[in-house]
Amino acid sequence: GIPCAESCVWIPCTVTALLGCSCSNNVCYN
């Protein structure tokens, strides 16, 4: 997928999750 410029190591994807991004390998991907 496309990296969403947000990490999810300590907390889940927040703002980017609203854009359809999900956590994968500690990074939010679209």
UniProtKB/Swiss-Prot annotation:
One GO BP: killing of cells of another organism
Pfam family for this entry, one: Cyclotide
Coiled coil: none
Disulphide bonds in the chain: C4-C21, C8-C23, C13-C28
TM region(s), chain numbering: none
Lineage: superkingdom: Eukaryota
UniProt keywords, alphabetically: Cytolysis, Disulfide bond, Hemolysis, Knottin, Plant defense
UniProt crosslink position (Cyclopeptide (Gly-Asn)): G1-N30
Modification note: This is a cyclic peptide.
Signal sequence region: none
KW Isomerase (keyword) present: no
Homology family: Belongs to the cyclotide family. Bracelet subfamily.
Record comment regarding domains: The presence of a 'disulfide through disulfide knot' structurally defines this protein as a knottin.
The protein's role, per its UniProt record: Probably participates in a plant defense mechanism. Has potent hemolytic activity.
Protein name listed in UniProt: Cycloviolacin-H4
